[in-house]
């Protein structure tokens, strides 16, 4: 606001040299009134919206960084990315080579197949990868009952049975 006020003052002095003191003072008063009205409208708008500016708002813009500090900051940022650290690394670089997770496509070929519960029903269902019947049955049966359908144990039992 001060800078704007100084600018208007300088403008007024410039006008005094070119137009005369009376015209310049009238122009200056007109400009000042217009600026005050605009500032008042802005303040009212901000108050109505409930937005409050922080106290350090003006200070942040006054601080100017030298070229050395800017160069240092950019170098530090590039080092962070090289070392795979920093807040943005994971977001952009960590998952760069990995394919995105794809949702399984649900085929619209009719109702879903019912789950097989008994070994007899399991035997009736064809295997997806050409597995043996015993293996497919063992996959469907609970853990306690799996030993009875274990192919290795079945072959041992078959050897024990006299022909």
UniProtKB/Swiss-Prot annotation:
**Motif placement: RxLR-dEER:** 33-45
* Cellular component GO terms, alphabetical: extracellular region; host cell cytoplasm; host cell nucleus
Main location as per UniProt: secreted
Q: Does the keyword Cell inner membrane apply?
A: no
Q: Does the keyword Secreted apply?
A: yes
Q: Which residues form the signal peptide?
A: 1-20
Where do the segments described as Disordered lie? 94-127
Cellular localization per UniProt? Secreted; Host nucleus; Host cytoplasm
Print the keywords alphabetically.
Host cytoplasm, Host nucleus, Secreted, Signal, Virulence
Similarity section: Belongs to the RxLR effector family.
Comment on protein domains = The RxLR-dEER motif acts to carry the protein into the host cell cytoplasm through binding to cell surface phosphatidylinositol-3-phosphate.
The record's function comment reads: Secreted effector that completely suppresses the host cell death induced by cell death-inducing proteins.
Entry protein name: Secreted RxLR effector protein 135
Q: Which organism is it from?
A: Plasmopara viticola (Downy mildew of grapevine)
Task: Kindly list the organism's lineage.
Answer: Eukaryota, Sar, Stramenopiles, Oomycota, Peronosporales
Q: Which gene encodes it?
A: RXLR135
